[in-house]
Swiss-Prot record:
Positions of GTP binding: 15-22, 65, 119-122, 147-149
UniProt keyword Transport, yes or no: yes
CDD domains: Ran
Limits of the Small GTPase Ran-type domain: 4-168
Protein name: GTP-binding nuclear protein GSP1/Ran
InterPro entries, alphabetized: P-loop_NTPase, Ran_GTPase, Small_GTP-bd, Small_GTPase
Organism name: Neurospora crassa (strain ATCC 24698 / 74-OR23-1A / CBS 708.71 / DSM 1257 / FGSC 987)
Function of the protein: GTP-binding protein involved in nucleocytoplasmic transport. Required for the import of protein into the nucleus and also for RNA export. Involved in chromatin condensation and control of cell cycle.
UniProt keywords, alphabetically: GTP-binding, Nucleotide-binding, Nucleus, Protein transport, Transport
Amino acid sequence: MAAATPTFKLVLVGDGGTGKTTFVKRHLTGEFEKKYMATLGVEVHPLGFSTNFGQIQFDVWDTAGQEKFGGLRDGYYINGQCGIIMFDVTSRITYKNVPNWHRDLTRVCENIPIVLCGNKVDVKERKVKAKTITFHRKKNLQYYDISAKSNYNFEKPFLWLARKLVGNNALEFVAAPALAPPTAVVDQELMEKYRAEMDEAAQMPLPNEEDDDDL
């Protein structure tokens, strides 16, 4: 009998319109096999990845847009084993709201591994710059620039979470999942520039708690 695939509940949160559903729908198998939970108004996408230690699966809980009507019910967070908080790099308010999502997530799930993702880096008019993205450093989260529409860095958050959950930094993804074709293109030179800016920002002291733009 085949061993059961290790499966983890991943809670995906962030303001409405930041691209959470677009992101999770990129994984075609997960999109095909998703299940709708009417009681919570949630779509659960089973996202499978092949690793050098065998298969691993994230059951990604997506709110299906109900976050637009206020906070999410605790049932959404309960038994969450890892999380992704998403904001839109073209919208400052979505980044300003990240601490609220983090507070809700950790209030129920406590000390779980969390990745902060800045989506839509394919859009040239970036508003949330590297030097202002400091929240992850204060709370010991991982951060990635992503572009859901172009599949840029799609696997990075899942790989980081998988390593944390399995407790092994030698874990690697050995086969790419089937992803939807890109509907946007990222400028690779610009992505390199963003990466360099994030590396540089990581060396800077954190702003004081009193600062208005302290996030």
